[in-house]
């Protein structure tokens, strides 16, 4: 797992404005910071999927918009539709840490042919790693040769 920055003030406020305030222009600097900090040893980039309901609410997938920038800056192929979130789950941030793994169990499906490919999953923030761990499990079952997590920020915990 590679994180560009620590999730702390003022970055936490910027990510919140981006994610919940519709400040899409922030995808460029957030994605650029991530692109500059990662080892470019993967074949494809897969954004963390967002459930349909949350996508309709928000109007965009924050991980996909960041992944577009990272893919462009690193010249690594982007597979935007490789995986889907098939379960409408409560937001991870609203749950106690111990419940987060259970919350995302069987939440993802990956239909893309990833056989033998090294995959980077791009997301905005990593806290417990439960969501990334579950998607990693699904990607490996789909044939990925390896999976790395690339996040803009991680919590100190």
Residue ranges and their predicted role:
Residues 1-121, 128-157:
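Conserved PRPP/pyrophosphate-binding segment of the phosphoribosyltransferase/PRPP-pathway fold
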